[in-house]
From Swiss-Prot:
The gene is guaA. The active site is at 86 (nucleophile), 181, 183. Pathway: Purine metabolism; GMP biosynthesis; GMP from XMP (L-Gln route): step 1/1. GO terms for cellular component: cytosol. Pfam families: GATase, GMP_synt_C, NAD_synthase. This is GMP synthase [glutamine-hydrolyzing]. Its EC number is 6.3.5.2. One of its GO terms (molecular function) is ATP binding.
Length: 525
């Protein structure tokens, strides 16, 4: 038996903050398993989960409103440490007898909090000292309401000029509340505070490490599928690749991967996938040449949403046909990751935890009665990448920029044709190659080329030619919800443009997209 890596676990109750998933990722980075649940859980669910500690997240609502969310009362009766963050602190204060008021002054941004009383949460943690030797912490505030009276059995640990209770604590019960966000990097000692809570106060061991996660996943796969055969749609993306490697380690030749080349992949990508997973790692792969079938289905279609649906539908058809050719396959594997699971479980009060399977592959044929294997469903994307490295996948592949599921189908604007895809593949490869050469690839979050179905006049030698236009796109973002266009050097852009126009016959003009998100989206379609 492998070690029980879920033995120590933190429960995070989500009150709707944009940072809640970040809290969970930080706890995982500390080597401790945690789960994110909607705030409206029942006592029975908490008892069954049996957490070592509970974190109450921030949230956009006001505790002063009558129907705003509250933590289940059992949270404060379970006998485990509780850590309230921002809204979580406010609801803790209100529920335990303190008082919260709306404030005219919204506190948003950097603040310095002064530690005025000793607490296990911040003992020995400081950014600087006041003139009389009191610890100061640089933190990130984002709140309107504030606690104006703490419960009678709590003490004030830290305050700012306009936030008298920036940290409150009941050391005996191990209840702590902070009015700032320890999970964001702007709170410089935030990770140390979370570590203090999770590792010291809750006494969780760091069992959640890539090597142990792999051992646990392999054992669970073997227990689930036994000697049965499993099929997986391998795309060459991060999630399906790591899923393939885990399954291969667990069940070897009982895994069959189906790789569908839809003609909408990057330059030489199909060959790279076959070389790496087939030749190098020795996986059992069925390679389906599907380019013509996808292009035929897309013929004459200009609408982006319709193109996505067609590509998805044809993929499912092809995958199903291949699955039916295989004898006795009992299980379908998918690269579902934890954010997919959270998304599908979004709280509808009372039905918070009906977690639907998040189908990447779409509907399977009625005649195929298959179970579902999802070895990554507990993991965040950054954890999936770390596991991939541990399993021997190359860094460049795991940390490559995101590529849309429909591939070039949504980077060729309007109707998709083979000619357009071939031109775009070559132009995009030049852009990416130059980014690597200039050491800029890892400085931008995503970079790609878009094919515009418009002809523009160009000059070649003594002649004029009407050829196609491509746009380069590069953005910087933390979460892909908002993004800035990347200010790439002019001489770099000039070099890329010259190479594309000179080396890709059929392109006469290169433009650079300087739109942010919002108002534009990152992808053009």
């Amino acid at each position: 038996m492998t070690e029980n890596i879920h033995k120590h676990r933190i429960l995070i109750l989500d009150f709707g903050s944009q940072y809640t998933q970040l809290v969970a990722r930080r706890v995982r980075e500390l080597g401790v398993y945690c789960e994110l649940w909607a705030w409206d859980v029942t006592e029975a669910q908490i008892r069954e989960f049996n957490p070592s500690g509970i974190i109450l997240s921030g949230g956009p609502e006001s505790t002063t409103e009558e129907n705003s969310p509250r933590a289940p009362q059992y949270v404060f009766e379970a006998g485990v440490p509780v850590f309230g963050v921002c809204y979580g602190m406010q609801t803790m204060a209100m529920q335990l007898g303190g008082h919260v008021e709306g404030s005219n002054e919204r506190e948003f941004g950097y603040a310095q909090v002064e530690v005025v009383n000793d607490s296990a949460l911040v003992r020995g943690i400081e950014d600087s000292l006041t003139a009389d030797g009191k610890p100061l912490l640089d933190v990130w505030m984002s709140h309107g309401d504030k606690v104006t009276a703490i419960p009678s059995d709590f003490v004030t640990v830290a305050s700012t000029d306009n936030c008298p209770f920036a940290i409150m604590a009941n050391e005996e019960k191990r209840f702590y509340g902070v009015q700032f966000h320890p999970e964001v990097t702007h709170t410089r000692q935030g990770m140390r505070m979370l570590e203090r809570f999770v590792r010291d106060i809750c006494q969780c061991e760091a069992l959640w490490t890539p090597a142990k996660i792999i051992d646990d996943a392999v054992e669970r796969i073997r227990q689930q599928v036994g000697d049965d055969k499993v099929i997986l749609g391998l795309s060459g993306g991060v999630d399906s690749s790591v899923t393939a490697m885990l399954l291969h380690r667990a069940i070897g030749k009982n895994l069959t991967c189906v790789f569908v080349d839809n003609g909408l992949l990057r330059l030489n990508e199909a060959q790279q996938v076959m070389d790496m997973f087939g030749d190098h790692f020795g996986l059992n792969i069925v390679h389906v040449e599907g380019e013509q079938r996808f292009l035929d289905a897309l013929k004459g279609e200009n609408d982006p949403e319709a193109k996505r649906k067609i590509i998805g539908r044809v993929f499912v058809e092809v995958f199903d046909e291949e699955a039916l050719k295989l004898d006795d396959v009992k299980w379908l594997a998918q690269g579902t990751i934890y954010p997919d699971v959270i998304e599908s479980a979004a709280s509808a009060t009372g039905k918070a935890h009906v977690i639907k399977s998040h189908h990447n592959v779409g509907g399977l044929p009625k005649e195929m009665k298959m179970g579902l294997v999802e070895p990554l469903r507990e993991l965040f994307k950054d954890e999936v990448r770390k596991i991939g490295l541990e399993l021997g996948l190359p860094y460049d592949m795991l940390y490559r920029h995101p590529f849309p599921g429909p591939g070039l189908g949504v980077r060729v604007l309007g109707e998709v044709k083979k000619e357009y895809c071939d031109l775009l593949r070559r132009a995009d490869a030049i852009f990416i190659e130059e980014l690597h050469k200039a050491d800029l690839y890892n400085k931008v979050s995503q970079a790609f080329t878009v094919f515009l179905p418009v002809r523009s006049v160009g000059v070649m030698g003594d002649g004029r030619k009407y050829d196609w236009v491509v746009s380069l796109r590069a953005v910087e973002t933390i979460d892909f919800m908002t993004a800035h266009w990347a200010h790439l050097p002019y001489d770099f852009l000039g070099r890329v443009s010259n190479r594309i126009i000179n080396e890709v016959n059929g392109i006469s003009r290169v433009v650079y997209d300087i739109s942010g998100k919002p108002p534009a989206t990152i992808e053009w379609e």
